[in-house]
Every structure is written in C-alpha cells, then in structure tokens.
A protein has these predicted regions:
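Long, low-complexity, polar and repeat-rich extracellular regions
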Residues: 1-314
C-alpha cells in the first residue's frame, strides 16, 4: 500500500506479512499521517512493515509485531515531530530494528512487551534533536542486542517499566548532551555476562535513579566461568559535567571463588560487577538512596576453572 498526500489515515486491522528485501507493507508520503496497526505483522528478509515519510506523523501499534533479519524494520518514521506509540508486543531478532524514528522532536512511547535478541538487533532506534522516550512496558534484551538506541541532544528519557539485560547486551544506549534521564524502573536487572543496563555518553546530562537496579550475573550459565572477570555494569556515564543522583535502590551481587594454582600464589578470585560507573571531568554524583553490596561464595560449579583464565603466574 502506497499513499501520497497530507493528513492520510490508515487503519490496518488485518495480517501484514513482508518478506521481500526492500519491500514495504504500508508507505505514506506526506505530513500529518496516522497509521494504526492493530493486527499481526511479520517482517523479514530486509523488508519494512510501515514507513511514513513526512512531518507530524503518528504510528499506533497495538498488535503483535515480529521483525527478523538484517535491514528489516517494523515501523519507520522519517520526519520531524514523529510519534510512535507501542501498546502491543514487539519481537526483534537477527539484526533487525523494531522501530526507527528519525527526525527532530520525535517521540516513542512503549506500554507493551519488547523482546530483542541477536547481534545488531535494536528494539527502538531514535535519532534527532529533542527526542522523548517513555517506557512503562516490559523489555527483555539478550545475545548482543540493544533495547533502546537513542541519539539526541536536550532529550528526555523516562524508564518506568521493567527491563532484563542478558549476555553482551545493552538495555539503553544514549548518546548526546543536555539530556534528562529518569530511571524509575520497578526492576532493571542486569543478569548477563558483559552486559550493561544503561549507557549514557555525552556532556551535561542529568541522570536520576529512583527505581530498583540489580546487577547479578548468572553464575549458572554455561559461559559464567569464561566471563567471570569481564564486568557487567548497571549504569555507565561517560563525559563531562554530568549529574547523577541515586534516590532509589542499587544492588550489586558479586561472587568470590576459593581457588588454587600450582604456584599457590592465589587463593581466591572475585567476580567483576559494577553498579554505577562515572568517568569524565566535572561530574557530580549524589548518593541519597540505598546502595547494597551482596557477596556470594562458590556460586560457580568449578571455581578452580576461574583462576586459570585471566590471572597470571608470577
């Protein structure tokens, strides 16, 4: 379906399947467009489900959307003041992008469930000045994926739902200056190896942590010993003149393993995990809330395996 003209409205209540590279299920070229997707959409092999080229566009997705494969995109808006409302389920795999909102003063509101997995996969990508991102849904990110990729200046990010971040993945990656980030999540759980909950890179950003953040790498995973010394982090802040305030609860769980080496120089190894990392000049950290550090002992099945991985003999 291809519509050209301003103030168009499309109500899609049926099933949409896009399987051909560079094919588009619904395309609207014009300003003030509204597209309502209430049915089930499946986009694979480099296709795009809904694409709106124009300003003041709105896409409302309340159905079930599955997006798979490199260059595949579920919903894309190219224009200023675009709004994407997610109130259904979104599954993104194989390097696909669930949502792309490209333009200034764009908004993405998620109230639904988002599952993102596999290298290069991004649940929501937004790029433009003055962006607004709001999440009150449940988000699960794993296997080298990114939940939200946000590039903006003077934007606003509010996370009030729940999020779980698995192996080698990032829940939210924010790049830009003078942004406001409110982390009021009821549960942000960083459970994967080399995983990051929230990554903020830029200057003069404000980060308020009012919810619950837990960093606890899964010690029962098959790769737990291999990545024992590689840190997982709750919140990373890089740049200058940033302001970070902890009013919520930040919990970090770290395992220690009683180990031995042939040289008998090492009798223990500590797992690397971090709750909050702030790097740069002129940054301010206000600790008003609860910081809880929990130690575990011998949570891995074979602690002797750990010491042989990274620690050198002297």
């Amino acid at each position: 379906m291809d519509i050209t003209g301003d103030s168009a409205t499309v109500d899609n209540k049926g099933t949409m399947t896009v399987t051909d590279p560079e094919s588009i299920g619904i395309q609207v070229d014009g300003d003030q467009a509204i597209v309502n997707n209430e049915g089930e959409s499946t986009i694979t092999n480099g296709g795009t489900g809904t694409q709106i080229n124009g300003n003041d566009a709105t896409a409302n997705n309340s159905g079930k959307t599955t997006v798979d494969g490199k260059d595949s995109t579920g919903t894309k808006i190219a224009g200023n003041i675009g709004i994407v409302n997610l109130d259904g389920s979104l599954t993104v795999t194989g390097g696909a992008h669930g949502v792309e909102n490209i333009g200034d003063n764009g908004t993405v509101n998620n109230k639904g469930d988002i599952v993102v997995s596999d290298t290069g996969s991004i649940g929501v990508l937004i790029n433009g000045e003055g962006a607004t991102v709001s999440n009150t849904g449940d988000v699960n990110v794993s296997n080298e994926a990114t939940g939200f990729s946000i590039t903006t200046n003077s934007g606003k990010v509010s996370l009030a739902g729940s999020m779980q971040v698995g192996d080698f993945s990032t829940g939210v990656d924010l790049n830009g200056n003078n942004n406001s980030v409110t982390l009021a999540a009821k549960d942000l759980k960083v459970v994967g190896q080399k995983a990051t909950g929230i990554n903020v890179s830029g200057d003069a950003n404000t980060v308020n942590i009012t919810g619950n953040v837990l960093v606890d790498k899964d010690k029962t995973a098959d790769n737990a010993a291999e990545y024992f010394f590689d840190p997982s982090v709750g919140i990373n802040v890089y740049g200058s003149d940033n302001n970070v305030t902890l009013d919520g609860k930040l919990t970090v769980v770290s395992d220690s393993e009683v180990t031995s080496r042939q040289s008998n120089l090492f009798d223990g190894s500590a797992e690397k995990t971090s709750g909050l990392v702030v790097i740069g000049d002129g940054n301010t950290v206000n600790m008003n809330g609860g910081l809880e550090l929990i130690g575990e002992k011998n949570a891995l099945a074979d602690g002797s395996q750990v010491a042989s991985l990274d620690l050198p003999l002297y």
